[in-house]
């Protein structure tokens, strides 16, 4: 099969992004999160106009093909009328997804993704429709008000030590009062809640200021719209649309790295918004000083405001996230040990944790099976293999020894003096929290100790985390290193 031409390849990511938005609206958030969110763009046959998508398991591939094939094809054809067929198959773990670098190119003529027709904004409960008593330019901006997803609000955002600063900053920014900082720069890894906070800012800001306008877009869409406006020789409309917003939010700004003309426009847009006293929220996957191939003047401007990091969720935060999600599912009966198991084992990011929970609930509902440990380990086999490979008892021992300045042999030695015994207990505790090893297996890796010794160590650390701030701080720091 011939690979797609550069023109086709350049358009596919944006087309898939638009199709995903259509699918979310058409199928509903729950169906999208459970079945469609994990789909990846695997291949494209430019001759036969066939899109191939990949998912994690055969069960998912069969279910999607049986129940959602029409929706998939309709979504793609809405964005790209020439598509003939959409196929879903199991992802090959040894192959890479179709990674496409969207560069600043002119869009090809002819059969290509067409822009979706603009529709009047529909009023949502949490987001006002087009602002009242505004200028014509403001009314045009109102078309973008419906971009905020209601479920991404402050009430649904679970707060913990990992995201407390970012949450408080976002709340302050959304109030709309006098600002001591502008822009607000949120950074952190994938799936930790940056986009959730940005949507929450938009929803809350418009709720408090119904006559104001807010605009959220990804940096990818910023570039795509900018290139399209240059091709249409109508950059004025593009600039006016962004710079007239009272609140402008650009997500994943690292996407414009190395794209000179887009960075030029981004800088002037950012400068205009801040100078005019309007609000600007930017997000990225790393801090400003760690962003590469971004102009220094942009990085300097970003650093003027408040820079807040969103860290990986610790065990307690993950546990609270699951409990919060289950509150909205009163029909679901999930045993406590399963809740703790999910919080311990799915620690990559919040998005993966929520996806795992949705998958368990959806599969249990469809198969009419009880949610027990056998069912969960079977349903999440792919995710659990990944997390098991990430952290081993040996990894934990090495990290604990580095933290307490001990030798690795101390983890297996018979020495019982406190300077060694306490870190060894911490390592046993972390081994139980972060791996799937049984108590006897953990004991074997600590010099052949009995499982009762491991139980004693776990209980000791659990007690000390309540009464000793230093121990609790050490444990939190070590867990965060593994979960980041």
Swiss-Prot record:
One GO term describing the cellular component: plasma membrane
Matches recorded under Pfam families: Bac_DnaA (PF00308), Bac_DnaA_C (PF08299), DnaA_N (PF11638)
Region annotated Disordered, chain positions: 110-146
Biased composition (Basic and acidic residues): 135-146
Domain-level remarks: Domain I is involved in oligomerization and binding regulators, domain II is flexibile and of varying length in different bacteria, domain III forms the AAA+ region, while domain IV binds dsDNA.
Protein family membership: Belongs to the DnaA family.
Protein's name according to its UniProt entry: Chromosomal replication initiator protein DnaA
Recorded name of the encoding gene: dnaA
